[in-house]
């Protein structure tokens, strides 16, 4: 298995665009609040790791302005072409295997990335090494084991099916080397990496139209793998997608834990 094989959800499939749109709706307000908190402004140099779609990169580009720089990296940059112009530089890069794409960054940020990277220890070291002294690291990652249910209010057969399929999704992720308890470890890992003033918080939506869109796109994207692994039948998946489409189920997400610290 190569490091990039660790990622289950291919960015080139149509559903990836739907998923990135849902992440933006669900998590951008939280991410932008944290980025503002750690400090991003004109002239800053930022590395956006595992950028995926364009919303965070575009926001960072507006904050740093023409005098700044945003290096946006991903193992698959196919969704980033629209923002690949100064101050944004887009590079294909595996954060678990490649050298950092520069050094002396004021800010390094990754959202919902390291949980998927088999060598996340190396990835974290690389991100810290790319900071200037005084630079800020912000890592936001899921902790699906902390809140494993897509339907926390499991009150009927629709919700039970949804939670069973979610369990299958988690198994596929874990089999690919994802650490499903990663989010909670971030404060300790940041301190162990030598960062100062480490703090963290968590956020998850309990229901939202974007959760519905995310669930539909995710299940359509992994349906073949769920069936091949014997974790669900095509009938299960059709029934679940129809339930999701019908509305009325309160679909949540795993908590996203945001942790930040300063390089001494
Ligand atoms: C769940 S998506 C999150 C995308 C984006 N950060 C967001 O929050 O909307 C995970 C992203 O990490 C990327 N990724 C997975 N493994 C990676 C690795 N080893 N190095 C760099 N990027 C990786 C994927 O290609 C994908 O774009």
Name each model feature, range by range.
Residues 138-210, 231:
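Conserved catalytic/acceptor-binding region of the Class I
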Residues 121-136:
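A short glycine-rich, Lys/Arg-flanked "PGG" loop and its adjoining helix->strand segment in the class I
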């Amino acid at each position: 298995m190569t490091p990039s094989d660790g990622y289950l959800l291919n960015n080139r499939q149509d559903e990836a665009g739907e998923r990135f749109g849902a992440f933006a709706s669900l998590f951008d307000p939280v991410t932008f609040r944290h980025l503002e908190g750690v400090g991003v402004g004109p002239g800053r140099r930022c590395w956006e790791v595992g950028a995926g779609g364009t919303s965070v990169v575009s926001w960072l580009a507006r904050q740093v302005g023409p005098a700044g720089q945003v290096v946006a990296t991903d193992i698959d940059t196919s969704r980033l072409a629209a923002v690949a112009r100064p101050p944004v530089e887009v590079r294909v890069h595996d954060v678990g295997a490649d050298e950092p794409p520069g050094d002396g960054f004021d800010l390094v940020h990754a959202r919902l990335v390291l949980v998927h990277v088999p060598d996340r220890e190396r990835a974290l070291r690389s991100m810290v090494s790319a900071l200037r002294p005084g630079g800020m690291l912000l890592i936001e990652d899921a902790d699906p084991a902390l809140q494993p249910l897509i339907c926390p209010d499991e009150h009927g057969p629709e919700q039970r099916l949804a939670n069973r399929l979610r369990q299958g999704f988690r198994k596929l992720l874990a089999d690919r080397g994802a650490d499903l308890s990663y989010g909670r470890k971030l404060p300790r890992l940041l301190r162990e990496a030598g960062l100062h003033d480490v703090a963290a918080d968590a956020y998850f939506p309990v229901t939202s139209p974007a959760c519905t869109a995310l669930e539909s796109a995710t299940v359509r994207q992994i349906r073949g793998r769920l069936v091949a692994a014997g974790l669900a039948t095509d009938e299960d998946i059709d029934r679940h997608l129809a339930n999701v489409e019908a509305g009325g189920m309160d679909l949540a997400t795993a908590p996203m834990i945001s942790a930040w610290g300063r390089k001494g």
